[in-house]
Amino acid sequence: MDFLELVEKRYSQRRYTAQTVKQEDLDYILKCARMAPSAVNKQPWHIYVLQGEILKQMAPIYRRETFKEAPMCLVITGNHNESWRRYDEKDHCDIDIAIVTEHIVLAAAEKGVDTCWVCNFDVQACKNLLQLPAAEEPIVLIPMGYAPKETVVPEKKRKDIEQIVTYLT
């Protein structure tokens, strides 16, 4: 599968079976995450792999069925004290987290593991549950697993190239 086929295949899955993610697939996904670039190579992220009881405790943090069904969830945190800031003090932590998250969801798609990129959750409750240090902010949740067989993948609706690209000479 080439890269375009991979990005066309990947979608946000919100329902999961109880089937666990194979350890070798998770290892591959995490190796791909490790290779993600970051501003000035700061790598201001940490990845928490949640399964079992701690995953059940996440249910109130993101109140959708996703956490009740997904057999695993990754929590991607960013450390704003470690991230690069450009000359005007713009913090690139969230940008770096987006890059590592995209590496994760695409590597998962390559292995046939379904994911959903979640940012709308109770950040403080997540931080408390995981007992994170003050400088570490939970930025992304990635429920992971396998879609039920009856899942219909929705058609992707994207703007035309002409709407998003301008050539300047």
What is the predicted role of each segment?
Residues 3-20, 25, 140-169:
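C-terminal helix-cap and adjacent tail motif
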Residues 106-109:
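Short hydrophobic alpha-helices that are characteristic scaffold elements of the AMP-binding
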Residues 78, 120-121, 146:
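Short secondary-structure boundary segments
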Residues 113-125:
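GST superfamily/GST-like fold recognition
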Residues 67-73, 132-153:
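A glycine-rich helix N-cap at a beta->alpha junction
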